């Protein structure tokens, strides 16, 4: 069987390397978040919601999806799960009855407060070598501009 690729192998393919790094990082974060009864995606959306509220934003599922750059349908499903767990509350917007507002419950806020430092510690350890490279963060930011 012949092999044709622009790259000499998997270790020179940026997409494959990013995939592997992402999988490794997500495994570490997922393992740490299990003790908080959160998946990685639940943590990201819950933390994003808390961040947005702390910065004076009214949070809707649409705004949360945009902020976290995730699919609105996935956000809807995850928010439903977070609501069942008692971490998020949904309510109708008094100014626009079609719009659903999101807020954290006390326990949801406590989950973020407890889990965030642990996830940040994992991030610091996992990305330490790459952060020494001058353009690592700006390179990631540049990738997100072209979506």
From Swiss-Prot:
Ranges of the DNA-binding region feature: 61-84
Keyword Acyltransferase in annotation: no
Tagged with keyword Ion transport: no
Domain HTH marR-type stretches: 11-147
Top-level lineage group: Bacteria
A Gene Ontology BP annotation from the UniProt entry: response to stress
Xref: InterPro entries: HTH_MarR-typ, MarR/SlyA-like, WH-like_DNA-bd_sf, WH_DNA-bd_sf
Protein name as it appears in the record: Uncharacterized HTH-type transcriptional regulator YdcH
Organism lineage: Bacteria, Bacillati, Bacillota, Bacilli, Bacillales
């Amino acid at each position: 069987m012949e092999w044709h690729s622009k790259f000499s192998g998997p270790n020179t393919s940026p997409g494959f390397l990013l995939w592997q790094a992402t999988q490794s990082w997500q495994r570490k974060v997922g393992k740490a978040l299990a003790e908080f009864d959160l998946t990685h995606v639940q943590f990201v959306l819950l933390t994003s919601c808390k961040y947005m509220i702390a910065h004076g934003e009214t949070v809707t599922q649409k705004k949360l999806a945009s902020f976290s750059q995730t699919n609105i349908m996935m956000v809807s499903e995850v928010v439903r799960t977070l609501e069942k767990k008692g971490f998020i509350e949904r309510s109708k917007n008094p100014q626009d009855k079609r719009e659903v507002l999101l807020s954290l419950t006390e326990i949801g806020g406590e989950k973020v407060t407890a889990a965030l430092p642990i996830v940040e510690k994992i991030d610091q350890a996992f990305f330490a070598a790459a952060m020494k490279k001058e353009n690592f963060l700006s390179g990631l930011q540049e990738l997100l501009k072209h979506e």
